[in-house]
Regions:
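Catalytic cores of large soluble enzymes that bind and process phosphate-bearing ligands
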Residues: 26-29, 47, 51, 68, ...
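N-terminal amphipathic/basic leader segments beginning at the initiator methionine
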Residues: 1-50
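Alpha-helical support elements that line or immediately flank enzyme active sites
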Residues: 75-97
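A broad, structure-centric signal for solvent-exposed, well-ordered loop/edge residues
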Residues: 43, 66-68, 73, 83
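Fold-independent oxyanion-binding glycine-rich loops
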Residues: 39-41, 52, 62-64, 77-80
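Short, well-ordered amphipathic alpha-helical segments that serve as non-catalytic structural scaffolds
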Residues: 54-65, 90-97
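Short coil/turn connectors at secondary-structure junctions
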Residues: 30-33, 54-56, 68-73
């Protein structure tokens, strides 16, 4: 396997890519817990999802969005699994995207 080569500027060094990480108050530690990566144009995308029978709303909605192999943004949170939120969780995940 090839060594990883870090690029100055990180992911935003790629033309058309914007990214941000913020403190949304999900984690009690007060650390950054929400990220957004945005492409100015739809891009080829692939993902690996859990095989667990109980999938959180964000996983289900993400599977819907990436079905055609394209994406324009990634929203990622940490500190809360968002599992077993029912129909409201699906609604909330769709609203975010």
């Amino acid at each position: 396997m090839a060594d990883v080569q870090w690029i100055d500027g990180g992911i935003t060094a790629v033309p058309g890519i914007l990214a941000a990480g913020v403190i949304a108050g999900i984690k009690p530690s007060g650390k950054k817990d929400l990220a957004l990566i945005y492409s100015s144009a739809p891009a080829r995308a692939a993902a690996v999802f859990t095989t667990n029978q109980v999938k959180g709303a964000p996983v289900l909605v993400s599977q819907e969005h990436i079905r055609d192999g394209r994406a324009q943004a990634i929203v990622a949170s940490s500190g809360c699994s968002n599992v077993c939120t029912g129909e409201q969780g699906i609604k909330d995940a769709r609203e975010i995207t």
